[in-house]
Swiss-Prot record:
Organism: Mus musculus
GO biological process: intracellular signal transduction; protein ubiquitination
PANTHER family according to UniProt: ANKYRIN REPEAT AND SOCS BOX PROTEIN 8, ANKYRIN REPEAT-CONTAINING PROTEIN DDB_G0279043
Gene, per the UniProt record: Asb8
Name of the protein: Ankyrin repeat and SOCS box protein 8
Signal peptide: none
UniProtKB keywords: ANK repeat, Cytoplasm, Phosphoprotein, Repeat, Ubl conjugation pathway
Domain SOCS box, first and last residues per copy: 235-288
Family per record: Belongs to the ankyrin SOCS box (ASB) family.
Amino acid sequence: MSSSMWYIMQSIQSKYSLSERLIRTIAAIRSFPHDNVEDLIRGGADVNCTHGTLKPLHCACMVSDADCVELLLEKGAEVNALDGYNRTALHYAAERDEACVEVLLEYGANPNALDGNRDTPLHWAAFKNNAECVRALLESGASVNALDYNNDTPLSWAAMKGNLESVSILLDYGAEVRVINLKGQTPISRLVALLVRGLGTEKEDSCFELLHRAVGQFELRKNGIMPREVTKDQQLCEKLTVLCSAPGTLKTLARYAVRRSLGLQYLPDAVKGLPLPVSLKDYLLLLE
């Protein structure tokens, strides 16, 4: 082997070793206790190198280290790069930490990036009920009605967990409450599936009431028969039967129609400018 080839191979090996140490340092795996991120980058660690399924930027978001996220971006980390799971750093940040989300968005992260299952960062923020991340993403142009592989929206993801805070914010931004996924499920039927498992709390009950106000009228029955899992809870079944049997009133149907006509914008601001009495504005905003 020529000396020049040996030198090139040694250089590549050294850089790879530094990059692996960078990942370990960010993740606080102290194989090298005296390592720090800035020194490793200065020494030649590649901020875009993938180790296994991980990239440094994604790893920093996983441990909610906003300072490290900003440092990596300053040093050239690709903000929309995909890791081994076809996820961007923003997918990880959206689940965990608003500060990381804000830094990534400032550096040009795509709020509508899709992972391997067509999930957006907003889907994950809503599912984890990270309300401030939900708000930050929506303010930065995230699609409130983005569809995953099953045609579920972020509202569906929030509803299936009974995440009241996230559901409320999504509805404020005009989320479509009557969306139906490929299995025929709606956000409210997703929430009912949680309630029938006996896992409902006061917050989940409040989430149901909010979704019910937003949708106006809904139907869970098929050919007049409630799903078998619903019938196992007699009290809940009776309540849902009454609600499903009640036709939507002109008032509730008008509320849904007006909210939808206002389009995809922050509805509290849009409603505020309407020439309506305060009581009607509150009604449109699902406050009563």
